């Protein structure tokens, strides 16, 4: 079942009123597609935007992960009202994990991950995404390229920049004992997501694992500023 148009309108109206972001047809379409994709994923339940118990004040809740009581939501930072990032909010409401920079990249990523996980046998998320997904992704493109690209490489090159994929690239370089490439990837990671403490914590751990403790401490300090 797809999320109703009224559900997306409710979330769009809430965002418009809460953050003074004009409700456009494009925003409405992307949010409606986001809701449908989340509704099609197992273990998630769509929630109303005013269900704000244990939700970060800058996040509009969209769905609840039933197994963990964490929330998937749209993050609207006070200093960048044009940004509609997709985040996971911890069950206590205090900690945010960035999932995607915007709804379109989140949807595109979910479609590719579904194809990768099922070898193209399942298309529930692609079908749920509607025109947004069809315009973003040509079916089987990842399947045709997976012999040359890992999933994290494909997502980074073809879909967008995701913290989870950049972490994966760094970890792959470390597994191959390629310290220089790992640190270059860390630098890209930092430059893409400068305002996210989780990034600095991860990079600090990387430097610590390489016994570069002074740099590890510098990144740890940056992460709490």
Residue ranges and their predicted role:
Residues 1-79, 163, 172, 194-201, ...:
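A surface-exposed partner-binding patch
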Residues 13, 79-82, 119, 127, ...:
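Acidic-enriched, low-complexity/disordered segments with a strong bias for Aspartate over Glutamate
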Residues 32-160:
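Long, contiguous interaction/recruitment modules in multidomain scaffold/adaptor proteins
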Residues 131-192, 202:
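Alpha-helical segment of the N-proximal tetratricopeptide repeat
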Residues 182-189, 214-224:
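Alpha-helical repeat scaffolds
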């Amino acid at each position: 079942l797809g999320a109703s148009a009224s559900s997306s309108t409710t979330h769009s109206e809430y965002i418009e009123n809460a953050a003074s972001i004009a409700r456009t047809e494009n925003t409405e379409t992307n949010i409606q597609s986001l809701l449908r994709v989340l509704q099609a994923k197992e273990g998630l339940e769509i929630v109303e935007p005013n269900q704000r118990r244990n939700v970060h004040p800058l996040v509009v809740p969209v769905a609840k992960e039933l197994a963990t009581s964490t929330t998937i939501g749209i993050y609207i930072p006070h200093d960048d009202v044009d940004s509609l990032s997709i985040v996971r909010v911890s069950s206590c409401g205090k900690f945010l994990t960035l999932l995607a920079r915007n709804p379109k990249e989140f949807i595109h990523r979910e479609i590719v991950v579904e194809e990768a996980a099922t070898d193209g046998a399942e298309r529930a998320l692609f079908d749920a995404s509607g025109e947004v997904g069809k315009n973003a992704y040509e079916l089987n493109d990842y399947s045709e390229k997976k012999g040359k690209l890992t999933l994290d490489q494909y997502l980074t090159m073809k879909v967008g920049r995701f913290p989870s994929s950049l972490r994966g690239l760094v970890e792959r370089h470390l597994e191959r004992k390629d310290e220089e490439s790992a640190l270059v990837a860390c630098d890209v990671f930092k430059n893409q997501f400068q305002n996210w403490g989780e990034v600095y914590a991860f990079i600090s751990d990387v430097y610590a694992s390489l016994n570069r403790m002074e740099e590890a401490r510098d990144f740890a300090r940056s992460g709490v500023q």
